[in-house]
A protein has these predicted regions:
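Glycine-/Pro-rich loop/turn segments that contact NAD(P) or position catalytic residues
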Residues: 95-136, 151-154
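Conserved ATP-binding module of the ATP-grasp superfamily
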Residues: 113-115, 136-139, 150-172
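Acidic/polar active-site rim loop that often engages polyanionic ligands
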Residues: 85, 106-112, 140-147
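ATP-binding N-terminal substructure of ATP-dependent carboxylate-amine bond-forming enzymes
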Residues: 1-102, 124
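Structured helix-beta-strand junction loops
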Residues: 24, 61, 83-84, 110, ...
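General beta-strand structural signal in soluble alpha/beta enzymes
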Residues: 67, 87-89, 116-119, 138-141, ...
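CheY-like receiver
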Residues: 57-58, 106, 128-129, 162-163
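Short acidic/polar capping segments at secondary-structure boundaries
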Residues: 122-125, 143-146, 157-159
């Protein structure tokens, strides 16, 4: 009996997972957000990955559930795990992909090598980081960025003044 893999998200990573899975004899189901997505030809369902009931219905009949992006809400994945759905990687791992500051703190706690970084919450904090690190930094929004969105190379805190309202930034 073949294993059935459910992939939440119909983007490029889902598309890249399909062929190797099929070669291994794995049946693949895809929950795409809309019909025009990269993996839409293999999609067996279309719906909102943020809606628990949509994802719950999709997960029925799959042996393992995964995702092709980090934007699936923690509460959705945790509810599925509580329902007995095998989710891999699990919500505890996903949180580090969802929050760059959390990831940096975890890597630091493990003693892993990484670039110098700081959590900054205002222009003064960013200016201090710039002064200590050669006057330029890569600044990232901790959540929601992808494919260059939420990333700026800056030499002045004013270049990210519009981002400080999100509460905290990652400076590297």
């Amino acid at each position: 009996m073949a294993l059935t893999l459910g992939i939440v998200g119909g983007g490029q990573l889902a598309r890249m997972m399909i062929a190797p899975a099929v070669e291994l004899g794995v049946d693949v189901r895809v929950l795409a957000e809309e019909p025009g997505m990269a993996a839409a030809l293999a999609a067996t369902a279309t719906g909102d990955y943020r809606d628990l009931e949509t994802v719950r219905a999709f997960a029925r009949g799959v042996d393992v559930l995964t995702f092709d992006h980090e934007h699936v809400p923690q509460e959705v994945l945790r509810a599925l795990v509580a329902d007995g759905v095998r989710v891999h990687p699990g919500p505890d791992a996903l949180q580090f992909a969802q929050d760059k500051l959390l990831m940096r703190a975890r890597l630091a706690g493990l003693g892993m090598p990484q670039p110098e970084w700081a959590r900054v919450t205002d222009a003064a904090g960013l200016q201090s980081f710039l002064d200590e690190h050669g006057g330029r930094a890569v600044v990232k929004t901790p959540r929601g960025g992808y494919d260059g969105k939420g990333v700026r190379v800056v030499a002045d805190p004013e270049e990210v003044a519009d981002w400080f309202d999100c509460g905290e930034l990652l400076a590297e």
